[in-house]
Swiss-Prot record:
InterPro entries: YaaA. Transmembrane segments: none annotated. This is UPF0246 protein RD1_0358. One of its GO terms (cellular component) is cytosol. One of its GO terms (biological process) is response to hydroperoxide. Pfam families: H2O2_YaaD (PF03883).
Length: 259
């Protein structure tokens, strides 16, 4: 199976003694960074919905973005992203063999880099996939990346001998993948919390994001190849709900708040 997750806005730039690889779409990342650095501070602030301080920080990041960055200026992607999904993934605690397996079976969708392997070297950035950054390919990043993402995922799935993709990414990011061009069965797990208030279980964004990362970790640590094995996921107290699930949308529920 191939698993996809979203990146994160927050970064952990601690040094890591881990070998890194070069992103497949490094040239595109450079091209997009040059486009972004040409924006005024006000335009960048509006484009990404940033405060003044964050707009200045990300303008500086785009200005410093290098075509061939020094090793000390980069970090491995899965260890650098620090959002909710990555709390669930806990990439820093994966052992060497698990990271090697993840390198082939986990992909991170990115507004700047397109598709990243866990150990791909990234420079600090923030550029959400939903950003309406105008490029030579269109008026937003969906139009820029759509064909490339589908081709890259198809090729990687073929290289590891699978026709199944586990979508643990957000709608914002997976929406950049052209569905008709994706030659894979897509399974999208749903994670819900039951407050026992008579209103039924609900998706709570923070918990759902963390659970997606935990599901990716579950696949990695168990080296899953059979989609039916996803039903065994029970991290954090979640339990598979067969009566609410379909083959391509397994549903997992746990009591709220999480213990």
């Amino acid at each position: 199976m191939l698993v996809v997750i979203s990146p994160a806005k927050r970064l952990d730039w601690a040094e890591r003694d881990v070998p890194v690889t070069q992103p497949d779409f490094q040239e595109d990342a450079v091209r997009l960074s040059k486009t972004a650095r040409n924006l005024t501070l006000g335009s960048l602030k509006s484009l990404m919905g940033l405060s003044d301080d964050l707009a200045r920080l990300n303008r500086d990041r785009f200005n410093a973005f290098a075509e061939d960055p020094a090793p000390e200026a980069t970090r491995p992607a899965a260890l650098a992203f620090a959002g909710d999904t990555y709390q669930g993934l806990e990439a820093t605690s994966l052992d060497e063999n698990e990271r090697a397996w993840a390198q082939d079976h986990l992909r991170i969708l990115s507004g700047l880099y397109g598709v990243l392997r866990p150990l791909d070297a990234i420079q600090p950035y923030r550029l959400e996939m939903g950003s309406r950054l105008k490029t030579r390919r269109g008026s937003n990043l969906y139009e820029y990346w759509r064909d490339d993402l589908s081709k890259a995922l198809n090729a990687q799935a073929q290289s590891v001998g699978t026709d199944v993709l586990i979508n643990c990414a957000s709608q914002e990011y997976f929406g950049a993948v052209a569905p008709k061009a994706l030659k894979l069965r897509v399974i999208t797990p749903a994670f819900m919390e039951d407050k026992n208030d008579g209103k039924g279980p609900k998706i709570v964004s923070f918990f759902a994001k963390k659970a997606r990362g935990a599901m990716a970790r579950f696949v990695i640590q168990n080296r899953l190849s059979d989609p039916d094995a996803l039903t065994g996921f029970d991290t954090g107290g979640y339990a598979y709900q067969p009566e609410l699930s379909t083959p391509d949308k397994p549903v997992f529920i746990r009591p709220y708040p999480a213990s």
